Regions:
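N-terminal Sec-pathway targeting helices
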Residues: 2-17
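Proline/serine/threonine-rich low-complexity linkers at boundaries of modular beta-sandwich domains
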Residues: 21-37, 123, 129-141
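Contiguous beta-strand segments within globular domains
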Residues: 42-55, 63-65
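Conserved structural position at the C-terminal beta-strand
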Residues: 56, 111-115
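Solvent-exposed loop/turn segments flanking beta-strands in beta-repeat/beta-sandwich domains
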Residues: 58-73
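Aromatic sugar-binding surface patches on proteins
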Residues: 85-96
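Surface-exposed, short loops/turns at beta-strand junctions within beta-sandwich domains
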Residues: 99-106
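Short, solvent-exposed loop/turn segments at the edges of extracellular beta-sandwich modules
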Residues: 114-123
Length: 141
């Protein structure tokens, strides 16, 4: 009789461990996609004082952070590095290039957003989008 109880407890414990393992695997594999990133205006030309608005969306786990980087002439400059206090399915944020110290001409704008999933050892899924932009500091004549 003691052996039956011991075996039942052992099987119950193994079942509990397997269920917990299955749940952990589900959590890791439930959200494999990074956030959607949209930018407005998306014209390719911009002035330093023009506000650029980002809309970041991740319905499953919410948006955790965004980093905006400018690449020009083999140099990189981070314009915005923001971690949202509360991950939400949709986040919006704005920035401009007023304090970037850029001159007229072409540059690449890179936006990387991360969600609040457990992927990448807790860093979340990431999405990186790049736009070729043209900075125009001269007012229209």
């Amino acid at each position: 009789m003691g052996r039956i109880i011991r075996n039942t407890i052992s099987y119950g414990f193994v079942t509990l461990i397997l269920a917990a393992l299955g749940f952990c695997i589900y959590l890791f594999l439930d959200d494999l996609d990074g956030p959607e990133v949209t930018m407005a205006p998306d014209t390719g030309r911009i002035s330093p004082t023009q506000e650029i608005t980002l809309k970041l969306a991740d319905a499953k786990s919410g948006v955790r952070s965004v980093v905006v980087t400018i690449h020009r002439n083999n140099q990189s400059l981070v314009i915005l590095d923001k971690v949202f206090s509360e991950p939400a399915p949709v986040q919006t944020t704005s920035f401009n290039l007023k304090n970037a110290g850029l001159r007229d001409g072409a540059f690449e704008l890179e936006i990387t957003a991360r969600d609040n999933s457990l992927m990448s050892f807790g860093k979340g899924n990431g999405t990186t989008r790049k736009w070729n932009m043209q900075l125009d500091t001269q007012p229209p004549k």
